[in-house]
Amino acid sequence: MAIDLFCYLSIDRGAAESDLNKIRSNHSELFEGKFLISPVRDADFSLKEIAAEHGLVAESFFLVSLNDKNSADLIPIVSKILVDGFNGGAILILQDNEYRR
């Protein structure tokens, strides 16, 4: 069973990449095997529509995928780390693009 966190950001791709690199570096114990992070990309029309349904104007987007099934209980912690790590903009995290984290 795949578990993905769909992460929508109100900041541009460059700022998001910078913040995400800091998060990866500060929490390498999570992001070097237990969870995999996709490259940040610009939010396209459909991604912007999904974010708008939840009250966010999305500029960028990335995925966090659970890579180690035994780490599923860490999903709330990973979500908190991401929220805290993006000080420059709002983040919307949807588990499997459906459930708000």
UniProtKB/Swiss-Prot annotation:
Entry function: Immunity protein component of a toxin-immunity protein module, which functions as a cellular contact-dependent growth inhibition (CDI) system. CDI modules allow bacteria to communicate with and inhibit the growth of closely related neighboring bacteria in a contact-dependent fashion. Neutralizes the toxic activity of cognate toxin CdiA (C-terminal 301 residue CT fragment) upon expression in E.coli. Does not inhibit toxic activity of CdiA from other strains of B.pseudomallei. Expression of this cdiAIB locus in B.thailandensis confers protection against other bacteria carrying the locus; growth inhibition requires cellular contact.
Assembly and interaction partners: Specifically interacts with the truncated CT fragment of cognate toxin protein CdiA-2, which inhibits CdiA-2 tRNA nuclease activity.
Native source species: Burkholderia pseudomallei (strain 1026b)
Lineage: Bacteria, Pseudomonadati, Pseudomonadota, Betaproteobacteria, Burkholderiales
Protein name: Immunity protein CdiI-2
Transmembrane segment boundaries: none
InterPro entries to which the protein is assigned, alphabetical: CDI_Immunity_Comp (IPR053759), CdiI_Bp1026b-like (IPR033805)
